[in-house]
Every structure is written in structure tokens, then in C-alpha cells.
Amino acid sequence: PCIEDRIIQQCILQILEPICEAKFYEKSYGFRPNRSAENAIAESVRLMQRSHMQYVVDVDIKGFFDNVNHRKLLRQLWTLGITDTKLIQVIKQMLKAPVLLPDGTVEYPQKGTPQGGILSPLLANVVLNELDWWIASQWHLQWKVMKKPPQMQIRKSGVRDLAHEYRDLRTTNLKEMYIVRYADDFKIFCKTRSDANKIKFATTQWLNHRLKLEVSENKTGITNLKRKYSEFLGFKLKLREKSNKNVAKTKMCDKARLRAKEKLKEQIKAIQKPENDMQLFTRICKYNSTVIGIQNYYCIATHIFEDFREI
């Protein structure tokens, strides 16, 4: 978008974001204030270790940002409390704005959000927020009032075990499941393969019929975290037994490690052939900042020392 459109989109973002943030699900971490990939990984590890979620459902949406249904998106904004018809009309015009392609032709988009648009990340969260709450409604939000309160349970450490008490309060016949989402990349954690198969099928159908989004069958699957790694946001997640407990093991995923290696190799080659001292200094600074950036992002992994040693 041109600079004028960017200014207008930023103004709209500052109006929409506080309203939408109040309605977004708590386990969504992508493109939101004071939330990051680190929080998403930490929540995934918590579910694996404390809630004993052994199976994870990976669902890959085909070209999500290019296939968002405009009519559905505008209805979702209205449902979230954006009821100013003039503002809705402006957002609609932004979504329908013609795009000039490299070959000189003009395309009039019928679906999708603008590439590189300031509003696009927020609109993506608006679309998938409905999925978050639907998954949560299957288990996390289901409660009942019991005539007899659940018996208090105390752990060996002396801490009150709320998890078992909450489990007694569930009123649903559906199985335990939790979603952790970062933009269009999300995982659904379950306890058994049977539950995972059911939620995989249900989620695929729900995305197709409710949000008009297609799922890539080749990239969608179920992983037993005790046997295989599952990749999420550049990390590999796995469960391993230690002292009769399940402990999460996290590392850099293979693709991320390979990309980091290649990037650093290219920068080292550039350092070896400088044209002058100033260029040498600039390239060394760039190399150092790249190393620090990789370290800062992946330092939360439990076995990152193995990956760094290999790099």
C-alpha cells in the first residue's frame, strides 16, 4: 500500500485493536500486544507436561491470507462490536482495492487480505478467533454446578491440585482438548489418538463450512509427542520420560537450523572479502546482530546448546 493508505490503515488499527483485543481468546499469541512466539511455546510446553497432552493435531490452512472470505470477515467484525457502518464500508473498500501485478495487469480481489497491509494481521486474528472459541467451547469452557463440591486434593509438594478439582466439574461428554495459536499456525492438544482423530475431522469440516477455508491434507496430521517431534514456530517439541514424569524436550527445527547455517555462512564469506575497512566493520556488526537474534529467539529451547554447537 502507498503511504496514504498506510496512514489510514494505522488509524483504523488504533481504533479496532482495543475493541477486538477484549474479545480475543487468551491462547492466541500472534500479532497481539505483549504476546510473542515465546508465550505460545511456553503454553505448549505447559500443556505437554502438566496437562499430559500426548497427542497434537497439526492443521495447515491452504493459503490462509489469500483465501479469507470477505463477507464472513465483515460479519465477524460486526459480531465483535464494530457496528459503525461507515467504518465497515471503508474496510470493505480496502479488501476490494485493485492490485497492480508485475506484468501490468490489474486484479480485483474477491477474497483474501492485502499483502503487507497494516490491518491484515488483525483481520487474520478476527477470522480465526471464532475457531479459538469453538475449540474452547468443546472442553475448556464447559462447567456445571455440582450439589456436592469436589473433594480437595493436595499434591506431594503441599500445593492444592486444582487440575483434578476442575476435572470433576466438567459437564461435557466431549473430550479434553486445548488450542494454542500463533496467527494461522496452530496446534490442538489431546490426550488420546481417538480424540485427536475426532477433532482433526471436526476441525477440517468446521473450517471448510464455517470459514470457507480449505485444509491441506498433506500437511495436516496427528503426532504422538512421545514418539516423534512436532514442529511449531521454528521449534521441535517432544515428550520424554524422566523420573516417571513426562518432560518436554524442545529444539530448533531442522529447516530453521539449516537456514541459520546458510545465512551465517554467506555473511562470513562477505566478511572475508571486504572492499574497505568501513565495509568490514559493517559486515561484522551485521553478523553479530544475526547471531544475537538467533540466540534471543531460540534460547527458550531446552536443548538449544546442541543446535548451537552444530551451527
Question: Where would I find each of the regions flagged by the language model?
Answer:
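Glycine/proline-rich, flexible active-site/cofactor-binding loop segments
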Residues: 1-25
